[in-house]
Amino acid sequence: MASIAPSLKRAHAPLRKALTASSTIRAFATVPPTSSETTKPKRKSYFKDTTVAEFSDFLATSSPAQPLSPAEAFTLRTAEVGPEGKKRTITRLPEWLKTPIPAGNDNFKSIKKDLRGLGLHTVCEEARCPNISECWGGSDKNAATATIMLMGDTCTRGCRFCSVKTNRKPAALDPHEPENTAEALARWGLGYVVLTSVDRDDLADGGAHHFAETIRRIKQKKPSLLVEALTGDFRGDLDMVKVVAESGLDVYAHNVETVEDLTPYVRDRRATFRQSLSVLKHVKEVKGKEGIITKTSLMLGLGEQEHEVMAALEDLRKADVDVVTFGQYMRPTKRHLKVEKYVTPDEFEMWNKRALDMGFLYCASGPLVRSSYKAGEAFIENVLRKRSGEKAMARGTLAKAVALDSETRSSI
């Protein structure tokens, strides 16, 4: 018995220690917080305290933007917002990212009304594009552009930069959509249209035949309308790429979105950089002799390095891609990837020059440029320049290009 007692004593020691400390714990629980505890600031979160932009940040000022020094360009301004006692610090958008509110001109109103009436969707609205009023309005009626989103508004993929809804089993395809889309576009009097779609991995063909049928209906109703198809990768099924490429479109676009190393982090895991390259390359193999234009787009500001962008451009040229666009990545919501950097206009101009020097037919590069931004003006101007034998340029007006083309044809 004498040998057991010490072991029991050791076994009960932790319990006695806990019981002794319990009164202290209860005492701490009833002590009111001190003044220093009540005034202790809340831990900052990245979204609320660093990246949230106010509505006013998206409005352009009446005065023209002033040139910024390098130090000013990389130092973003902050502001205190909110009621007294609940103030928070936000980072304001750079001046070059501010846009005017949609003015609602006749083209804009007509397009929006018809979309609602025919139950059609546009990526302009679903992806919250900042250029919607400029593209839907157009510099004149024939220069207006619109981007119709086919096959519904719900995607089967979940890319970390995109604000489009996602679901494994979206609604069934609307069999009337090809005809309704063609009817709307013929009515609007546009000069150029971009057709895009959500990814439909739930369909055996990825929606390729639905896409192709829509293009054929459009060309039947209005052969003069230039059609660009911005497609997904069809899970790498090149036969489905061929179906769309042979449907009568003028421009085949597929976006690589970002550099190769960031692709697994930015895009859905079912998409790869090399798979996207194979799509663009196959289009040229199928319809290259007929002069089809291929196009892609990259977002900047996701953390990419300069040498990675150069490597992406080199790969795109090897795939014989004709047109490339660069734009600033803008975070749609707090659930999406954060902006790593706001790229300055000078840097976008640098990439514009480099792309043209590498042999791309055309490059649109700027903070607010999107894959289909001013698609009609960019395409028409540069194809007409090429037709006239003049080197493709990054600047110029649609009117000048049309006049140049008319002079060339009259002299033949």
UniProtKB/Swiss-Prot annotation:
InterPro entries assigned: Aldolase_TIM, Elp3/MiaA/NifB-like_rSAM, LIAS_N, Lipoyl_synth, rSAM
SMART domains assigned to the protein according to its UniProt record, in alphabetical order: Elp3
Major subcellular location class: mitochondrion
Molecular functions (GO terms): 4 iron, 4 sulfur cluster binding; lipoate synthase activity; metal ion binding
Pathway participation: Protein modification; protein lipoylation via endogenous pathway; protein N(6)-(lipoyl)lysine from octanoyl-[acyl-carrier-protein]: step 2/2
EC number(s) given by UniProt: 2.8.1.8
Binding residues annotated for [4Fe-4S] cluster 2, in chain numbering: C155, C159, C162
Signal peptide start-end: none
Localisation per UniProt entry: Mitochondrion
The keyword S-adenosyl-L-methionine belongs to this UniProt entry's keyword annotation: yes
Transit peptide feature range: 1-28
CDD domains named in the record: Radical_SAM
Top-level EC class as recorded in UniProt: transferase
Cofactor(s) for this UniProt protein: [4Fe-4S] cluster
Domain Radical SAM core: 138-361
Annotated residues for binding of [4Fe-4S] cluster 1: C124, C129, C135, S372
Name of the protein in its database record: Lipoyl synthase, mitochondrial
